[in-house]
């Protein structure tokens, strides 16, 4: 009877689905109002002129226009704004 009894099931073998975060529209792009610019966790990038922020910190365009990224202030704070077209 040279058999080994079955071991317990592994504790590994799980992973969460990717959340597809990141910049969706880049600097200089012309976009319509309502377009998502950035999906993020927390305010890595802050909303500037003509940009709104959703409850999950998603940044979106409030008006049609051109995307503009800037870094201002101390501490260096990234902001994204829309220059109306």
UniProtKB/Swiss-Prot annotation:
A GO CC term assigned to this protein in UniProt: cytosolic large ribosomal subunit
UniProt keyword terms in alphabetical order: Ribonucleoprotein, Ribosomal protein
Entry's Gene Ontology molecular function annotations: structural constituent of ribosome
Keyword Secreted: no
Matching PROSITE patterns: RIBOSOMAL_L27 (PS00831)
Record region (Disordered): 1-24
Entry-linked InterPro entries: Ribosomal_bL27, Ribosomal_bL27_CS
Pfam family, one: Ribosomal_L27
Gene Ontology BP annotations: translation
NCBIfam families for this protein: L27
Protein name as it appears in the record: Large ribosomal subunit protein bL27
Taxonomic source organism: Nitrosospira multiformis (strain ATCC 25196 / NCIMB 11849 / C 71)
Protein family membership: Belongs to the bacterial ribosomal protein bL27 family.
């Amino acid at each position: 009877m040279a058999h080994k009894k079955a071991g317990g099931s592994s504790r590994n073998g799980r992973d969460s689905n990717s959340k597809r975060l990141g910049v969706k529209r880049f600097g200089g792009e012309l976009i319509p109002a309502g377009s998502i610019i950035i999906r993020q966790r927390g305010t890595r990038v802050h909303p500037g002129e003509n940009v709104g922020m959703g409850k999950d910190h998603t940044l979106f365009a409030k008006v049609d226009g051109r995307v503009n990224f800037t870094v201002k202030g101390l501490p260096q704070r990234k902001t994204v704004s829309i220059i109306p077209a």
